[in-house]
Amino acid sequence: MNNSQKSKIIIKILNKTYPKVPIPLNYKNTFTLLVSVLLSAQCTDVNVNNVTKKIYPKYNKPEHFVRLGRKKIESLIRKIGIFRIKAKSIFYLSKTLIEKHNGKVPNTYEDLEKLPGVGHKTASVVMSQGFGYPAFPVD
């Protein structure tokens, strides 16, 4: 058995032992995934899902949140901890995505971590769940 065959067997065993676990947050696209992960800081996923289920059917793109403005975002996420700080991050994150990334969520750690409110853990979750890159998000 050559190294390539051994590698395939090892990968098969690892994939079976450590399957991809879906994130418990509900989202519609990579942008709403990013927002949900940002909202989940110091908050339960259940609470985030309860709040976002009323938001995402209508507001699910960066331009939607820029049009809403910070105060309206605050009122929509009021039930989530530190909502004023998170609303500010979501507003400026959305604005930055439009101005620097054509409204798209970037798919590199470097670009994600430059976005307002996005740290390495948030970037890791988005890279893994949103783009399928191997990542190990750590809180």
Which residues make up each language-model segment?
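Catalytic cores of DNA base-excision repair glycosylases
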Residues: N2-D139
